[in-house]
C-alpha cells in the first residue's frame, strides 16, 4: 500500500554534516580525556595541537569543532575533574557517617582521584594551574571551595568527637600537601593498592596505632 503524502512528510532525512549531539558529547569527552593524559605526561606547554589530534584519532584541525583553543581544553579538563571529585565527596557528605568513617572515605576518594590510572584530571589541575587563564580560574575555584568545605566539615566533626585537635587554617593545607605528593612517588602495581595506601594515610593523619580499630 503506497504511503500517503502526509506520512511521507513526517519522515525527515537526517542532514549530513555535524554529528548527532550524543556523538558530539562522546567525542568531546574522549578529547578531554586524551588531552588530560598528554598534559599529565608531557606538560601543557609541550603538548601541541597535533599531539592532541593524533591521540584522539582526528585530523589536525578537526578538534577545533569542539574547542577553539588549547586553553579551553585545559579549562575543561580541570572543571570536569573537580566536578567528578566533588560529586563523590557530596555523596559521602549526604550520609550520616561517623566522623572517622567519613574521613576515611574522603581520603580514599582523594587518592583514587589522584592515582587511579584513568584519572589524569586532578594531576593536571595541581601541576598546570599557572597555565590556566584568569577567567577560567573563577569556575574552578568555586568548585574547589565546595570541595574543601566538605573536608573542613569532617575535620570539625573529628574535633568535636575528640579525634582532632583544635583545627587551624593550615591543617587542611598540610594534609592536602601530603596526600597530593603521593602522585610523585606512588607506582601502581608496586604491591600496595590505593585503598591500602588510603588506610595508611588515615592511620598516619589520625595517629591510629597499627592494629588498633578506629
Regions from the language model: what does each represent?
Residues 76, 90-120:
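Hydrophobic alpha-helical connector segments
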Residues 83-87, 124, 134-160, 169-173, ...:
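Amphipathic alpha-helical packing segments from all-alpha helical-bundle domains
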Residues 1-26, 96, 213-214:
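N-terminal intrinsically disordered/low-complexity leader segments
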